[in-house]
Amino acid sequence: MISYYFQGFALGAAMILPLGPQNAFVMNQGIRRQYHLMIALLCALSDLVLISAGIFGGSALLMQSPWLLALVTWGGVAFLLWYGFGALKTAMSSNLELASAEVMKQGRWKIIATMLAVTWLNPHVYLDTFVVLGSLGGQLAMEPKRWFALGTISASFLWFFGLALLAAWLAPRLRTVKAQRIINILVGVVMWLIAFQLAREGVAHMQALFN
């Protein structure tokens, strides 16, 4: 059964490594050393819920509800455009240190709300956990399925805590004005690229619904 664990771990790691809204947010919180371990835990727990739902039967709900998928997609587009705009606005600020200080004033609950948004309003999360993992893990018998799910969940916990701790460790180098400007530009551009990609997918979904 351990082979199913490592299959799940490898697949989970491959899907979580690319830079996306979750990773960017965890990295930034690590650099700021602001509730970064709490955010890593909440991201990992969110993945635990989504992965479990996808592998143990939740994928059928999403696949049978095209309107739900469309709603999640366009909600994600709107949020990613807003999030990317905020990052680019900070990067282009004439006083980046002041802009960064304003971000640091955010309270715990606002940070948690943002974390929930970057996780649960990201349609790619549902496609990864419900469609990809659900289709692969759903074909397995119950015992291998549990090991497969445990492997993917382990990859999520290891990645988010590793990313948060590494970003916090590198914080002295990554908190410079130049580094912060580069990071915010990178995050903003990536968020907008993902948003435009999702918008194209959303248009395709809407055309399929009305045809």
Curated annotation (Swiss-Prot):
This protein's record includes keyword Transport: yes
Residue ranges of the TM segments: 1-21, 37-57, 68-88, 111-131, 147-167, 179-199
Any one cellular-component term (Gene Ontology): plasma membrane
An annotated Gene Ontology molecular function: L-arginine transmembrane transporter activity
Subcellular location: Cell inner membrane
Signal peptide: none
Alphabetic keyword roster: Amino-acid transport, Cell inner membrane, Cell membrane, Membrane, Transmembrane, Transmembrane helix, Transport
Catalysed reaction, written as an equation: L-arginine(in) = L-arginine(out)
Topological relation to the membrane, as annotated: Multi-pass membrane protein
Annotated family: Belongs to the LysE/ArgO transporter (TC 2.A.75) family.
Functional note: Involved in the export of arginine. Important to control the intracellular level of arginine and the correct balance between arginine and lysine.
Annotated protein name in UniProt: Arginine exporter protein ArgO
Gene it is expressed from: argO
